[in-house]
A protein has these predicted regions:
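A donor-sugar binding/catalytic signature common to diverse glycosyltransferases
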Residues: 56-105
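Short hydrophobic alpha-helical runs that function as membrane-insertion/retention elements
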Residues: 36-37, 91-92, 113-115
Length: 182
């Protein structure tokens, strides 16, 4: 059977991703696995496109990510959360805003690796993919976090998140909490 692909996406608005795609093409070729590049900006792709790489302009991440071996991306919260919900390992090459922090958080959760900002090196991306795909603890951790995002003991995840915020603040459930006084 064909191995699951590594999905590579720099986000829908990133037009400065040529080096990410070049590095990903080299890293996945070296690893011997197919890759799927998702971007509307085909001028960012290596030319000619390597045989092991498929390109699509857009894809429904909620359907695509569960079928991926890993997702390599920019670390935006939308892509990060969709990959986390799919239970798939992630490599983040964040450049700005919350992206590097999102990558660091994925590392702490045991489901991702974060590359330094700037142009990615194929060797660093190859090493990050190997670390994720060869570590027997990463895939089960990714699946656990995906389950936790869906439910926690049958309770919807958003309700559980609100309860955790209340617990952390010391307020407890809202029904018994008093609003702050001035």
């Amino acid at each position: 059977s064909t191995p699951k692909p590594v999905v590579v996406t720099p986000g829908s608005a990133n037009r400065q991703a040529a080096e990410l795609f070049r590095a990903a093409a080299l890293a996945t070729e070296r690893r011997g696995i197919p890759s799927l590049f998702v971007t509307p900006w085909s001028d960012q792709l290596p030319s000619p496109l390597p045989e092991h790489v498929t390109h699509v302009q857009r894809a429904p991440f909620s359907a695509l990510f569960p079928r991926a071996a890993a997702v390599v991306h920019h670390g935006g919260i939308g892509t990060t959360s969709q990959a986390l919900a799919a239970g798939v390992p992630q490599v983040v090459q964040g450049r700005c805003f919350d992206q590097p922090d999102n990558g660091a958080r994925l590392e702490r959760l045991g489901v991702g690796r974060s590359l330094a900002a700037g142009d990615p090196e194929a060797g660093a991306l190859f090493a990050a993919l190997n670390a994720l795909l060869d570590d027997p603890e990463v895939e089960p951790a990714a699946r656990r976090w995906a389950r936790a995002m869906r439910t926690d003991a049958g309770e919807p995840a958003m309700e559980r998140a609100a309860d955790l915020v209340e617990e952390a603040s010391g307020a407890g459930p809202f029904s018994g909490a008093r609003p702050p006084t001035r």
